């Protein structure tokens, strides 16, 4: 099975937006704005906000995009895995890719209620540094996480 991480291409747009929309709908059942977010709106946001401001990477299996990562330098803006592909290592591969690109450290925000995402990031050495509220339209409680390479080393030494 040919699996790889590669840079995003414009031809990936429909597949990537579909992954993002499906994963968001499944993950954010607690956010009314997400449940009302249409695929058409997702395409608009993707073009206006994500493609124009982020470095994009996709994870593929047999040339099919199954996950994507959007970075604003060392800030993980988005990381989504298609629901049928979740818990298959794609998110971990993308996190490791981001760590290789930005070995000095990474930051991200996720929703406080996203317990699965929070556990995932914490398993990868991210530490919660601030609790707050996400910007509109969500305006939901969020958590800011940081990863620093020395934290990973300390976790390995302690056997975590």
Give residue ranges: language-model regions.
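Conserved GNAT acetyl-CoA-binding A-motif
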Residues: 101-113
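Conserved N-terminal entry element of GNAT/NAT acetyltransferase domains
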Residues: 1-11, 151-160
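Conserved beta-strand in the GNAT
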Residues: 58, 63-80
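Conserved active-site tyrosine of GNAT-family acetyltransferases
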Residues: 121, 126
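Short glycine/proline-centered loop/turn elements that form peptide/ligand docking sites
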Residues: 91, 95, 113-117, 133-141
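Conserved acetyl-CoA pyrophosphate-binding loop and the N-cap/start of the following alpha-helix
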Residues: 84-85, 89-98
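Conserved GNAT-fold acetyl-CoA-binding loop/helix
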Residues: 13, 18-46, 54
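Residue-level recognition of the GNAT/N-acetyltransferase active site
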Residues: 9, 77, 82-86, 111
């Amino acid at each position: 099975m040919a699996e790889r991480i590669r840079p995003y291409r414009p031809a990936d747009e429909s597949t990537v937006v579909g992954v993002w929309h499906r994963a968001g709908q499944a993950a954010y059942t607690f956010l009314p704005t997400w449940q009302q977010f249409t695929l058409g709106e997702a395409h608009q946001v993707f073009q206006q906000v994500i493609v124009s401001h982020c470095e994009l990477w996709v994870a593929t299996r047999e040339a099919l995009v199954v996950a994507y990562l959007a970075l604003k330098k060392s800030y993980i803006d988005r990381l989504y895995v298609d629901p049928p592909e979740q818990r298959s290592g794609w998110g971990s591969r993308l996190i490791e890719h981001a760590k290789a690109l930005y070995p000095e450290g990474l930051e991200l925000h996720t929703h406080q209620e996203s317990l699965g995402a929070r556990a995932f990031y914490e398993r990868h050495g991210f530490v919660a540094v601030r609790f707050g509220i996400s910007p509109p339209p969500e305006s939901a409680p969020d958590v800011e996480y940081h990863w620093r390479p020395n934290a990973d080393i300390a976790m390995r030494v302690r056997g975590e």
